[in-house]
Design a protein with these regions (language model features):
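Positively charged, small/polar-rich N-terminal and surface patches that mediate targeting and assembly
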Residues: 1-152
Length: 152
């Protein structure tokens, strides 16, 4: 059995850094705390600048076989790493189960990220529906809430 983080992560993938920035700005205007936001994307100077400007620190470099080198930061990254710190080995598709997503969701998020998408997540159970609405409204493709049991 897979251990699942009891907090809720709402995840969406934006087509590029420009769209991700718009979505993140909207999340912040909606009152979602910067420390609840995570960003995972293919390594680039543009992604590094987005992470640093949004989260106030540099992204961690993680290399997976499915995506190549990524830059990542935020509470989702810690949850995906797990106690074994095996995100690099298992990739997004193998670790998103830890935060309540099905394997096929993990493969979709991994594929979109490998194609240059910017994965943005929010860790906030009470505001999961709000985060989902913002992600959808600002172009966060395949936005979903991991193992969410509430109602929209």
């Amino acid at each position: 059995m897979v251990d699942v983080d009891t907090g809720r992560f709402t995840v969406g993938v934006f087509q590029d850094v420009k769209w991700a920035q718009k979505g993140i700005d909207a999340l912040r205007r909606a009152g979602l705390a910067p420390e609840s936001i995570s960003i995972i994307a293919k390594e680039s100077a543009e992604v590094g600048a987005l992470i640093e400007a949004t989260l106030g620190a540099q992204g961690e470099r993680i290399e997976t076989s499915a995506t190549g080198p990524l830059l990542a930061r935020g509470p989702l990254v810690a949850a995906l790493q797990g106690p074994a710190r095996d995100l690099a080995k298992l990739g997004l598709s193998g670790t998103l189960r830890r935060v309540g997503f099905q394997a096929h969701d993990g493969r979709i998020f991994e594929t979109l990220t490998a194609r240059g998408g910017v994965l943005v997540s929010v860790h906030s159970e009470p505001r999961a529906a709000d985060a989902l609405a913002v992600l959808h409204s600002y172009g966060g493709g395949n936005a979903a809430i991991g193992a969410w049991t509430g109602r929209v």
